[in-house]
């Protein structure tokens, strides 16, 4: 390969790397907030009168359906 082609490829590589970095800016360190949940205080009305396994299955199904229907679908 000629030196011009190599130089052009290196410039293109550096340009694409800089664009990739600019597309994903870092989040500030203070933007992450932790949420503390006290298990005894959590009350789920949908789980009243059923066992722990059934309650876990219902919560999992609800979370899965919520995840499916909040996705961005491009028809």
UniProtKB/Swiss-Prot annotation:
Sulfation is important for activity and for the binding to a putative membrane receptor. Deletion of the sulfate groups of Tyr-67 and Tyr-69 resulted in compounds with respectively 0.6% and 4% of the activity. PSK-alpha is produced by endopeptidase digestion. PSK-beta is produced from PSK-alpha by exopeptidase digestion. Keywords: Developmental protein, Differentiation, Growth factor, Secreted, Signal, Sulfation. It comes from Asparagus officinalis (Garden asparagus). It holds the Pfam family PSK. Its main location: secreted. GO terms for molecular function: growth factor activity. This is Phytosulfokines. Induction: Expression is regulated by a signal transduction pathway activated by auxin and cytokinin. The modification Sulfotyrosine is found at residues 67, 69. The keyword Secreted applies. GO terms for biological process: cell differentiation; cell population proliferation. Promotes plant cell differentiation, organogenesis and somatic embryogenesis as well as cell proliferation.
């Amino acid at each position: 390969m000629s030196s011009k082609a190599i130089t052009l490829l290196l410039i293109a590589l550096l340009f694409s790397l800089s664009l990739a970095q600019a597309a994903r800016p870092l989040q500030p360190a203070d933007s992450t907030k932790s949420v503390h949940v006290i298990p005894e205080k959590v009350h789920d009305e949908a789980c009243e009168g059923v066992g722990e396994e059934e309650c876990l299955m219902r919560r999992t199904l609800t979370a899965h359906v919520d995840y499916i229907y909040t996705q961005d679908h491009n028809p």
